[in-house]
Amino acid sequence: MSLTQDQKVEIIKQFGTSEKDTGKSEVQVALYTRRISDLTSHLQEHPKDKHSRRGLLMLVAKRKKILNYLKNVDIERYRKVIGELELRK
C-alpha cells in the first residue's frame, strides 16, 4: 500500500533534477499521484474502508493545491507534469 524506498527513488529520478530533489513541485505531484493510485486500488477491494477514503481525499486535495501553485508560477512545467502523469485530458 505504501511506496517502497526504491519506488520513491525511481519517481524522484524521473521528475527531479537529482536523487535527493524531493521538494520540487513535479516530484511531489508524482509521489502523491502514485499514492493516490495505490489507495484507489485498495478502496476498490475494500469499499467500506472509510479511514482510507478520507486519506485519499486528503491526498487529492494536497495534490490539487500543488498543481494550482505550479499552474500560477510556471504554466509550462504544469502542462509538462499533467502530460507525463496523464492527469487531465
From Swiss-Prot:
One of its GO terms (cellular component) is cytosolic small ribosomal subunit. Keywords: Ribonucleoprotein, Ribosomal protein, RNA-binding, rRNA-binding. The keyword Glycoprotein does not apply. The keyword Ribonucleoprotein applies. HAMAP family: Ribosomal_uS15_B. One of the primary rRNA binding proteins, it binds directly to 16S rRNA where it helps nucleate assembly of the platform of the 30S subunit by binding and bridging several RNA helices of the 16S rRNA. Forms an intersubunit bridge (bridge B4) with the 23S rRNA of the 50S subunit in the ribosome. Belongs to the universal ribosomal protein uS15 family. This is Small ribosomal subunit protein uS15. The gene is rpsO.
